[in-house]
């Protein structure tokens, strides 16, 4: 047993210090990034935000809606090959280039992903997703995927420490997904005692990944556009959002009615709700590590997307970053004990 004395920080523990700026308007800020990925050697340009691969967020409808904002969607792994075929038949190449194909690490997952990728060459992203990216089996699967799909851009996770980030990049991942426990419907930290404050995880993993020519995506912990800005400021190349994009018309959650008001169910992918839906229930050897919440319906996702992008542009103007790429270089975090004036929050 050992104790690390360094204080680790989440998004709620800091604010970004404003700096002098020559920008005249938020419209002067360029949010689009251009990347060439380490292993796939593929080039990509767009807004580096990703809708999470949850079945109540990462839907085909969400992918179609967010593609118009140049935002990626990690489509959840529970669609059949036939459903993928129908989606591809009805989608433009521009939509497909904003889609990530999600997969688990079983042999069946591998075969299914292979079939999906064979449907259309425009599908360039694979998201290999497990709750715990520290297993040897996971690293071996990433290497197997890289060998099978040498020209596909592979995103793999989740991990929260630099050494595991390096391990995954050396095994074939182009992008490492960072985050254990910060999600809005994740209870891993409560059930297991395991986790890492998200901002510190992002800063440390970005440092490790960038040293090897890899990239990271900050997955979880964002509750506001300001948190998205903090994740980019901390060095994240991409930011993945779940709860912020849940409850919309495109989110795909089941709608329930209570006292004449409609709500959409949103749940973590290790929750009892998810396991009942996809594997018939919670296995007796494990505990559910997610919760289910009812969200008021929030309408089309385009309004939320504009709010997030607007907040991000504004953050850039406050620190004098004319491009999103410059935000991390212009960011100085200050430690704080309060984020906002909450006097009217309950009205």
Curated annotation (Swiss-Prot):
Binding partners and assembly: Homotetramer.
Listed InterPro entries: Aldolase_TIM (IPR013785), GMP_reductase (IPR050139), GMPR (IPR005993), IMP_DH/GMP_Rdtase_CS (IPR015875), IMP_DH_GMPRt (IPR001093)
Keyword Transcription: no
Protein name (database record): GMP reductase
UniProt family annotation: Belongs to the IMPDH/GMPR family. GuaC type 1 subfamily.
Keywords for the protein's UniProt record, in alphabetical order: Metal-binding, NADP, Oxidoreductase, Potassium
List of residues binding K(+): 181, 183
Biological process terms in GO annotation: purine nucleotide metabolic process
Binding positions (NADP(+)): 108-131, 216-239
Reactions this protein catalyses: IMP + NH4(+) + NADP(+) = GMP + NADPH + 2 H(+)
Cited PROSITE patterns: IMP_DH_GMP_RED
Active site, renumbered: 186
Function: Catalyzes the irreversible NADPH-dependent deamination of GMP to IMP. It functions in the conversion of nucleobase, nucleoside and nucleotide derivatives of G to A nucleotides, and in maintaining the intracellular balance of A and G nucleotides.
UniProt GO cellular component terms: cytosol; GMP reductase complex
Top-rank lineage group of the source organism: Bacteria
Keyword Metal-binding: yes
Known EC number: 1.7.1.7
UniProt-listed Gene3D superfamilies: Aldolase class I (3.20.20.70)
GO molecular function: GMP reductase activity; metal ion binding
């Amino acid at each position: 047993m050992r104790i690390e004395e360094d204080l680790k920080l989440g998004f709620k523990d800091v604010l970004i210090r404003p700096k002098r700026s020559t920008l005249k308007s938020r419209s002067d800020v360029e949010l689009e990034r251009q990347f060439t990925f380490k292993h796939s050697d593929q080039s990509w340009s767009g807004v580096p935000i990703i809708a999470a691969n949850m079945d109540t967020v990462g839907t085909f409808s969400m992918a179609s809606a967010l593609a118009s904002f140049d935002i990626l969607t990690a489509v959840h792994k529970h669609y059949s090959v036939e459903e993928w075929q129908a989606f591809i038949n009805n989608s433009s190449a521009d939509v497909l280039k904003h889609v990530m194909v999600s997969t688990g690490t079983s042999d069946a997952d591998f075969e299914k992903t292979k079939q999906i990728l064979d449907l259309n060459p425009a599908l360039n992203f694979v998201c290999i997703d497990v709750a715990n990216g520290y297993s040897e089996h996971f690293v071996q699967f990433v290497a197997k995927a890289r060998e099978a799909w040498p020209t596909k851009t592979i995103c793999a996770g989740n991990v929260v420490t630099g050494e595991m980030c390096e391990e995954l990049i050396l095994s074939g991942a182009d992008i490492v997904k960072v985050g254990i426990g910060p999600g809005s419907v994740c209870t891993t930290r409560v059930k297991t005692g395991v986790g890492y404050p998200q901002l510190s995880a992002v800063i440390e993993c970005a440092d490790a990944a960038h040293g090897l020519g890899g990239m990271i995506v900050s997955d979880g912990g964002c509750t506001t556009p300001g948190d998205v800005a903090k994740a980019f400021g901390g060095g994240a190349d991409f930011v993945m959002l779940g709860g912020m994009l849940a409850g919309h018309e495109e989110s795909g959650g089941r709608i329930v009615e209570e006292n004449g008001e409609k709500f959409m169910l949103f749940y973590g992918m290790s929750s009892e709700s998810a396991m009942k839906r996809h594997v018939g229930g919670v296995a007796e050897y494990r505990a559910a590590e997610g919760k289910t919440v009812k969200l008021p319906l929030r309408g089309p996702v385009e309004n939320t997307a504009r709010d997030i992008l607007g907040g991000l542009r504004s953050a850039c103007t406050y620190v004098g970053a004319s491009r999103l790429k410059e935000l991390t270089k212009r960011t100085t975090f200050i430690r704080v004990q309060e984020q906002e004036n909450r006097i009217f929050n309950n009205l």
